[in-house]
Amino acid sequence: MSLLSVIVPCYNEEQTVADFYHELVKNDAFFRENEIDMELLYIDDGSRDNTVEEVKKLRELDERVHLVSFSRNFGKEAAMYAGLKKSHGDYVVIMDVDLQDPPSLLPQMFGYLKEGYDSVATRRVSRKGEPPVRSFFARLFYRLMKKISKTEIMDGARDYRLMTRQMVDAILAMEEYNRFTKGIFGWVGFQTKWIEYENVERVKGETKWNFWKLFIYSLDGIAAFSTVPLMIASLMGVLFCLFAFIFIIFIIVRKILFGDPVAGWPSLVCIISLASGVQLFCLGIVGQYLAKTYMEVKKRPIYLVKEEI
């Protein structure tokens, strides 16, 4: 009898916790036929609503349901990491509680594992129902990552992924504080099968990911899996030094040959302002990487557990 660990991060999801459970257990017949036992791990990321109480109600009905509740909101990345740490399964799957990750795909995903794959991942082939601006910047992010990172991150990739214990242990070996799981999946390697499906809208409630949070998350991903921004900052510094050197030679030659006085305060102010802006931009890039390093060396725990059942 093999064990499947289902990891479900939750943040203020009282409306969807029960719906997810009832949709997931529709696979029970498949699990029995294939001698698969299940543990369902709800990872509460410091919810302020009745998410914890809803999970406890499910626990009274089904002992396969477990709860790990954080002391505060640490973020989805911390919740996924905690779920992987707490899991005991021979196979582990990460799913969103809002049912945008269809549990009905699990039998198909297990079929691919039997073919010898270490991981079965999912990606959306459309973004129907999303705001156009959000979809545009999401595609832009994936195209950018493809160009500047050596780690492959598929366009439209979801966190919904079924993995073997060997792959999970490899991910857990990466104990970095600043986590970008989509990149970590690609970095550890292993043979992966991709399943594509149309975008599924939330069953209830509203997304907790606004544009600003997604923007910060994308910056974390770039800083975690690419050093190209640092190279760009260095290149811009070299180019401006070269420009300044050429401009100095131009002024000297103009003075010697034509005797023109050095003038043009407006243009000089514009050049200084532009150079200062570029310097601050490059300093911001360096600061982003320095901040990540600072958080790593402090070695604070990725999450703190308040309650566990």
Kindly label every feature range from the protein language model.
Residues 13-16, 47, 102:
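Donor nucleotide-sugar binding loop of glycosyltransferases
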Residues 13-30:
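Short, well-formed alpha-helical segments that are part of the catalytic scaffolds
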Residues 32-46, 68-69:
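Short beta-strand/loop segment that forms part of the nucleotide-sugar
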Residues 3-5, 39:
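Cell-envelope/extracellular polymer assembly enzymes that use nucleotide-activated donors
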